[in-house]
């Protein structure tokens, strides 16, 4: 996928509260939340921008990244995919 988000994947970061929220929402055990999310994003072929945010859908996860600052805002389970599995 050739877009600005993937070109700037190394700039993606989050806040301490963001790490806590994402770990809780995705039920992650890893301490390196940002790298986990970046790796998942790189695998996605469903990336789109809507307004000021990028949305990345991969498997059961949906990631939201601010388009200007590349801050990973949140991640959560994709309820549609989860119910279809």
Enumerate the predicted regions with their spans.
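Ribonuclease/tRNase effector modules and their secretory precursors
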Residues: 1-85
């Amino acid at each position: 996928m050739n877009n600005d988000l993937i070109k700037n994947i190394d700039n993606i970061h989050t806040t301490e509260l963001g790490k806590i929220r994402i770990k809780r929402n995705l039920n992650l055990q890893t301490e390196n939340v940002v790298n986990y999310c970046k790796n998942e994003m790189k695998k996605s072929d469903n990336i789109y921008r809507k307004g000021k945010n990028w949305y990345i859908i991969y498997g059961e996860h949906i990631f939201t990244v601010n388009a200007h600052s590349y801050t990973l805002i949140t991640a959560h389970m994709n309820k549609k995919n989860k119910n279809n599995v």
